[in-house]
């Protein structure tokens, strides 16, 4: 942050040891990129395997993909509405799958036990930079959804049902990404740390039930994030009368 005239203490907060990549004056958390590429590769591999030989009577990976498709379609339709949900299904589905696989990777893979020359690996969603980026992406998406569908009429949302709501609606635009990012970050980081500590202290049996609990929590967090993203988009495209 050398290009800023003042120091930002919050930006200096860190959890764990990081693998840094230096690109010019920009310092990046390299472990987030590494594990994100692994997650994206796993998702692409799943899609390739599931769609390589499509059959009328699905089974195996194709059956799983069709189940996910139906699930995400129903989620988007419920939260966004019949008229607009098709446009946002790919976005909601991508969010859900990336967060879901990232979270499960954090629960199943003891990343912190994989030694690097410097730093340590971890689930992408256990890094605040990732969750904030995802939350800001959701914010940009619902602004875009509202403006592209309604034009300047989108700003009627801020005075509905009464102009007194304007400051509250503006504050809400800041609290939405904050709550999305910190909820996901806190839950996944806590799960990773608990599993890593238990694996270190009692490496055989005790971590197993905690890992299963982590899998359940990870799936719920992915569902909550995707559902709230779809809800915010649906709220933005909703017509107020």
Swiss-Prot record:
What's in the GO CC field?
plasma membrane-derived thylakoid membrane; proton-transporting ATP synthase complex
> In terms of domain of life, where is this protein from?
Bacteria
- Disulfide partners: none
Query: Which keywords fit this entry according to its UniProt record?
Result: ATP synthesis, CF(0), Hydrogen ion transport, Ion transport, Membrane, Thylakoid, Transmembrane, Transmembrane helix, Transport
| Compartments (UniProt record) | Cellular thylakoid membrane
Q: Where are the transmembrane segments?
A: 30-50, 91-111, 128-148, 193-213, 214-234
Q: How does it sit in the membrane?
A: Multi-pass membrane protein
Q: What does this protein do?
A: Key component of the proton channel; it plays a direct role in the translocation of protons across the membrane.
Question: What family does this chain come from, according to its entry?
Answer: Belongs to the ATPase A chain family.
The name this protein goes by in its record: ATP synthase subunit a
Organism of origin: Prochlorococcus marinus (strain MIT 9303)
């Amino acid at each position: 942050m050398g290009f800023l005239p003042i120091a930002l203490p919050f930006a200096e907060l860190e959890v764990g040891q990081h693998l840094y990549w230096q690109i010019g004056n920009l310092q990046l958390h390299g472990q987030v990129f590494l594990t994100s590429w692994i997650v994206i590769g796993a998702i692409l591999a799943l899609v390739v395997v599931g769609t390589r030989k499509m059959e009328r009577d699905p089974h195996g990976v194709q059956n799983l993909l069709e189940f996910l498709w139906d699930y995400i379609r129903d989620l988007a339709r419920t939260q966004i509405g019949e008229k607009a949900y098709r446009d946002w299904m790919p976005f909601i589905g991508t969010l859900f799958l990336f967060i879901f696989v990232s979270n499960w990777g954090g629960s199943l893979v003891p990343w912190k036990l994989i030694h690097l020359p410097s730093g340590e690996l971890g689930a992408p969603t256990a890094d605040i930079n990732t969750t904030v980026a995802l939350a800001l992406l959701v914010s940009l998406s619902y602004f875009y959804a509202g403006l592209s569908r309604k034009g300047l009429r989108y700003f009627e949302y801020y005075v509905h049902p009464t102009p007194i709501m304007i400051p509250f609606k503006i504050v809400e635009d800041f609290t939405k990404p904050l709550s999305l990012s910190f909820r996901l970050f806190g839950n996944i980081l806590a799960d990773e740390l608990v599993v890593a500590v238990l694996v270190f202290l009692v490496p055989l049996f005790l971590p197993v039930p905690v890992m299963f609990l982590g899998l359940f929590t990870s799936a719920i967090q992915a569902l909550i994030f995707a559902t709230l993203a779809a809800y915010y988009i649906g709220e933005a495209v909703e017509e107020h009368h």
